[in-house]
A protein has these predicted regions:
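Class II aminoacyl-tRNA synthetase catalytic cores and aaRS-like
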Residues: 2-687
Length: 687
């Protein structure tokens, strides 16, 4: 039984367990060496059968008195902002301020200087202490301050004194340091103590199990959470005040419906019945459109039981909106206004009035991705018509494939480019491309000192065409890749993934500068349906098809409608994704607002069974009751904040993220169900 990362497992010895339980609580201390954790000194762990660990076995009366005193601490009468205001009227005033004790310097037995950090840990003022009696006759505040450990929370009763600011270039230039005044300590109320077994320094690295200390010790995490709060406020103000949206909360206990992703089920005490946590508020917001709500918005919690990556969490937050009597253009213009305001107010960055549009087909053709990073350049071109047949056979086993080429300008020195290629191909990042069943990439380096500039395998004519097409210069990396001659499906192609991997490696090794700025684009004209994927649940129809996004998306045009039954894979969706710097910030669509049409798509195109159709009866009924045309979108809020702050992982902008295995390492969730819980919810584990 693991109590924590510092506790000792007692499961191996029932005899030891029995002896421990027979001892008084204060004696149940293990002298065995505890497990190692970063950021802590070793200390014994205390076992309690109820699962509670005691950190002290001191005098109970003393503990009660300490806590009683902390209940009576004085209210703050002055803020750090007021202290920093250069207001001379504050001098010699008695104030109460709250904060955390910082570094202390004992100048002598009778003179101590200490830092006091404000509640947000963003500002610091100097405390000055000399021996006195407390205002209530208690022990000397001077002694209390000298005994308190750094990071302990306190209430300071003191007098503001003017302080001569240090000369330019000679003083402490730390951000938030108040230099115009200091506070002479008259009394101090210790509100808690910071334990001596936790070592907190600027360079201390705390593990996820100590997320509270990560946040406390890392101002970038605290700043990200504050930034996130401001962004949420701006989103609400822009949509509700400027665009007349109504913020509405939708239920978290929903029902299981086959929308495309795996769900989390919540069992009930009624045998066989369970709720499902919503993948998104999609159906509820469409129901609101049929309820006479013209514009809905919610900063919503959503849940998906899917594979985790840097930009995925099992629970996540999205800015969810829907508009009645609206088209895709209406939604996109509204979202552009929100994005402009966010970037303007939080980053002082000018975003274009409107964002460019690019079809799914164009994005996949030019960049090998449906969320292209336009800042990288390196557009992909088709060249199978000019590449010799023997070269095609050398780069893969495919017969009559599509062959694509791109260039990446690594270095002006061809030898440096060769060195980079060797390093990359030997790295783990290259393995997916080396093991591609459709063939490895052909990699060439343009070098004017070589025959045909290093492109001799292309033959004279093709080498000349490729040089002119790509505008090649010495040191440019030329990549050739074959793929099956099929329509695009999914989110990327091998050469598109290689484009990103090579750029990332080139930046890492100093050959290219990291891309800067923000490049926004809308990706539209997605296929409405895709072939079923065994790794995803889809909608459970029998047609071998799945809705590419969800089954409520409308075909784009009348021409697409004509193909719905005869050529469903050729139908374009009225769907649009907002992409910036290779990240999909969000996606939306115009919805099917007709009950007959919605039923046709589910029953006739996807071939859902009658049982599956019953899962959507509520929505069909809402659409039948005169639901107006409507469209909407959801912005991934965690992802949006990460992109704005330049973070690689959404975990850096979430207070308590899950690990790559979906675990909360601090609170140790998820937990194993007990036999009692299993019995309550009528569950059994299959062997």
């Amino acid at each position: 039984m693991t109590l924590s990362s510092r506790a000792i497992s007692l499961a191996a010895s029932s005899a030891l367990r029995s002896r421990l339980l027979s001892l008084p609580p204060a004696c149940r201390i293990l002298s065995l060496e505890p497990a190692f954790t970063r950021g802590r000194r070793s200390r014994p762990a205390i076992y309690q059968p109820e699962g509670i660990r005691l950190y002290s076995s001191g005098n109970t009366s003393e503990a009660l008195q300490k806590f009683k005193k902390s209940l009576q601490f004085p209210s703050a009468t002055c803020s750090f902002e007021q202290l920093a205001s250069q207001n001379q009227d504050l001098n010699d005033q008695r104030v109460v301020i709250h904060g955390y004790v910082g570094a202390r310097r004992d100048a002598s037995k009778n003179l101590t200087f200490a830092e006091l950090h404000d509640m947000s840990l963003g500002s610091t003022v100097q405390l000055v202490s000399t021996p006195t009696k407390g205002v209530d006759g208690s022990d000397s505040p001077h002694n209390v301050l000298r005994e308190l450990r750094e990071h302990s929370p306190v209430a300071i009763n003191g007098t503001i004194k003017a302080r001569k600011a240090p000369s330019a270039g000679k003083g402490d230039s730390r951000p938030g340091l108040i230099t115009n005044v200091e506070v002479k300590v008259d009394d101090i109320t210790a509100l808690n103590t910071f334990p001596d077994d936790i070592i907190m320094a600027k360079d201390t690295v705390f593990p996820p199990e100590q997320r509270h200390l990560q946040i406390r010790n890392d101002d970038s995490l605290r700043n990200a959470l504050a930034f996130r709060s401001k962004a949420a406020r701006i989103v609400r103000n822009e949509l509700c005040d400027e665009h007349s949206f109504t913020e509405i909360e939708t239920p978290l206990l929903f029902k299981s419906t086959p929308e495309g992703a795996r769900e989390f089920l919540v069992p009930t005490r009624v045998p066989g019945l369970a709720y499902a946590l919503p993948q998104s508020p999609q159906q509820y917001k469409q129901i609101l459109m049929g309820s006479g709500i013209p514009r809905y918005v919610q900063i919503a919690k959503c849940f998906r039981d899917e594979d985790l990556r840097a930009d995925r969490q099992p629970e996540f937050t999205q800015v969810d909106l829907e508009m009645a009597f609206a088209s895709a253009e209406d939604v996109m213009r509204t979202v552009e206004a929100v994005v402009r305001r966010l970037w303007s107010e939080l980053l002082a960055y000018d975003v274009p009035e409107t964002f460019p549009r690019m079809s799914y087909e164009e994005a996949m053709s030019k960049y090998g991705s449906d969320k292209p990073d336009l800042r990288l350049g390196s557009e992909i071109r088709r060249v199978e018509y000019m590449v010799p047949v023997d070269l095609v056979s050398k780069i893969g086993p495919l017969t009559d494939p599509i062959v694509e080429v791109m260039k990446i300008p690594i270095s002006e020195d061809a030898n440096e480019t060769r060195k980079f290629v060797g390093t990359f191909m030997d790295s783990p990042e290259a393995q997916p491309f080396i093991q591609n069943p459709h063939g490895q990439p052909g990699i060439f380096i343009f070098d004017s000192r070589k025959p045909l500039q290093g492109l001799q395998v292309f033959g004279f004519e093709a080498a000349e065409q490729v040089e002119e097409m790509l505008e090649l210069e010495d040191g440019d990396l030329v990549v050739l890749q074959a793929r099956p001659k099929e329509d695009f499906s999914g989110g990327s192609t091998p050469i598109g993934n290689l484009r990103l991997a090579l750029h990332k490696a080139a930046v890492k090794h100093g050959y290219l500068r990291a891309p800067e700025g923000f490049a926004f684009t809308w990706i539209n004209d997605f296929p409405l349906f895709s072939p079923s994927n065994d790794s995803e649940p889809g909608q459970g129809g029998a047609a071998g098809l799945a809705a590419t996004h969800h089954p409520f998306t409308s075909p784009k045009t009348a021409e697409d409608m004509d193909l719905l039954l005869s050529e469903p894979l050729s139908v374009r969706a009225d769907h649009y994704d907002l992409v910036v710097n290779g990240v999909e910030l969000g996606g939306g669509s115009r919805r099917i607002h007709s009950a007959e049409m919605q039923e046709l798509v589910m029953r006739e195109v996807l071939k859902m069974s009658d049982e599956r159709m019953k899962d959507f009866e509520h929505l069909i009924e809402v659409l039948r009751a005169g639901c107006p045309p409507h469209a909407g979108l959801a912005l991934g809020f965690d992802r949006l904040i990460a992109v704005m702050l330049g973070k690689e992982s959404v975990r850096d902008v979430i207070a308590f993220p899950k690990s790559g295995k979906g675990e909360d390492m601090l609170v140790k969730s998820p937990t194993k169900m007990t036999d009692g819980q299993m019995e309550t919810y009528h569950l059994k584990l299959r062997a």
